[in-house]
Regions:
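Short, charged, low-complexity patches
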Residues: 7, 11, 15, 131, ...
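Short, solvent-exposed helix-loop connector elements
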Residues: 1-9, 28-37, 56-60, 87-88, ...
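Conserved pre-catalytic core of RNA-dependent polymerases
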Residues: 142, 170-380, 388
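Short, intrinsically disordered, charge-balanced linker/junction segments flanking boundaries
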Residues: 1, 388, 397-400
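Basic/polar low-complexity segments
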Residues: 14-33, 59-176
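Short amphipathic alpha-helical heptad-repeat segments
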Residues: 41-49
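Amphipathic alpha-helical blocks
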Residues: 2-32, 90-94, 142, 151-153, ...
């Protein structure tokens, strides 16, 4: 599918075709979900409840009503058990620091499932800002941080990197339909996607059929060094870094990106790690498979105990440093230079450059959307590739 079309055009054809067929064979039905619902209540349960109540209003406790009531009860109990069983498994397998959040989720009461950005910042309240104006203010704040840096530009890169980009030291790999199918099945499907994303159940059921056009698009991306424009739009939900946010500084932007962009990121991360995996500082515990904050704490305690046993050590001073908005303050030109110096080939550098260039963001706040904002710097939080690129940027920060 797509032939010699650019990735953006090929992606547009693919998404339009899929959405047209989806609307034709699976038309949308509106189901209202309340913040007072239990966390295991699904759209199907709400739909059955509505049918049951409608039948009761028309004909009382008819045979059809009893059948619908039975279906509703069975579905409700099944989803409740599934929800609790899943969270029990998660509790048994989770890291120690995550246990509280899992337990809190298991004991969710009506009203606990309210959207995470229902807070109102005191400054916005005192200025009498509408939800739309607040969304715009938050978007301007986050965009302003990223705009501290110049956009990614080949002319701003060192000469050695420019020469590398003009050369072709190796050819990009070619993936097949089976490779794409495995990544589609493995990729995490968020409960709330971005506009245009396919429903999770459709992706799950039709993964084999979707794999063919997806692998064609990914091969087109690696061959052309272009990233689809549609996949560079971030739908950002601000969440509080503290229980009660006071200012925009207390907010963390969590990005949602198109599902098939995430699938492509899985491949890019895999290819990057083939070149730089062994060069990542062994003291980097966050975002690295097999490492966790628990490993860091053990290493830190070990460092303290070893130095306490030393005869020439009388005191140990530990200084904890936190860089403000570090994820939003990434210089893309510096990042590409570091990747090049770590041995990443030109074709893969071009793919990463395409991923980072011309990104845009829109804030979702209390059901309102801000206008699109340009992001010449920073990295999308909540994305697989964005996390690895941040690790690369700070890789040489540690020293003995």
């Amino acid at each position: 599918m797509g032939g010699d079309l650019p990735p953006s055009h090929q992606t547009e054809v693919f998404e339009n075709l899929i959405n047209d067929k989806l609307n034709q064979f699976c038309p949308e039905k509106t189901v209202r979900i309340s913040s007072q619902d239990k966390p295991w209540v699904t759209a199907e349960i709400k739909y059955l409840d509505r049918l049951k109540n409608r039948e009761y209003t028309k004909k009382g406790k008819s045979l059809k009503y009893k059948q619908l009531a039975k279906q509703f009860k069975e579905k409700y109990e099944m989803e409740a058990k599934k929800y609790l069983r899943k969270n029990m498994d998660e509790l048994m397998d989770c890291k120690p620091g995550q246990a509280y959040s899992v337990l809190k989720k298991m004991g969710a009461q009506p009203g606990d499932c309210i959207d995470s950005n229902t807070f109102t910042l005191p400054g916005h309240e005192s200025e009498n800002l509408s939800d739309q104006e607040s969304a715009e203010r938050i978007a301007d704040y986050f965009a302003q941080i990223s705009q501290e840096f110049p956009p990614l530009d080949r002319k701003l890169l060192p000469l050695r990197v420019q020469q590398k980009l003009d050369s072709q030291s190796s050819l990009p790999p070619i993936i097949d339909s089976h490779d794409a199918y495995q990544k589609i099945k493995a990729a995490k499907k968020p409960k709330s996607g971005v506009p245009g994303d396919l429903p999770r159940v459709i992706v799950q059921e039709f993964a084999p059929e979707l794999a063919a056009p997806v692998y064609s698009i990914i091969n087109n991306i690696t061959q052309s060094g272009e990233w689809p424009t549609q996949w560079k739009q971030e739908w950002v939900t601000p969440i509080g870094k503290v229980p009660i946010p006071e200012t925009e500084d207390d907010l963390r932007p969590i990005s949602l990106t198109p599902f098939f962009s995430k699938v492509t990121e899985h491949f890019v991360v895999m290819w990057l790690l083939e070149y730089i995996g062994e060069l990542i500082d062994f003291r980097q515990y966050g975002g690295i498979k097999g490492n966790s904050i628990t490993h860091y704490l053990i290493e830190f305690l070990n460092f303290i105990l070893i130095n306490q046993d030393s005869t020439d050590q009388t005191a140990i001073l530990a200084c904890m440093v936190d860089f403000k908005k570090a994820f939003n303050r990434q210089n893309h030109n510096l990042l590409i230079t570091k990747l090049s110096d770590m041995g990443v080939p030109s074709w893969l550098l071009k793919v990463v450059m395409a991923f980072l260039s011309d990104r845009k963001m829109v804030i979702r706040y209390k059901g309102k959307l801000s206008s699109m904002k340009n992001l010449p710097g920073g990295g999308p939080q909540g994305t697989l590739l964005g996390l690895l690129l941040f690790i690369v940027l700070i890789n040489d920060a540690g020293f003995e």
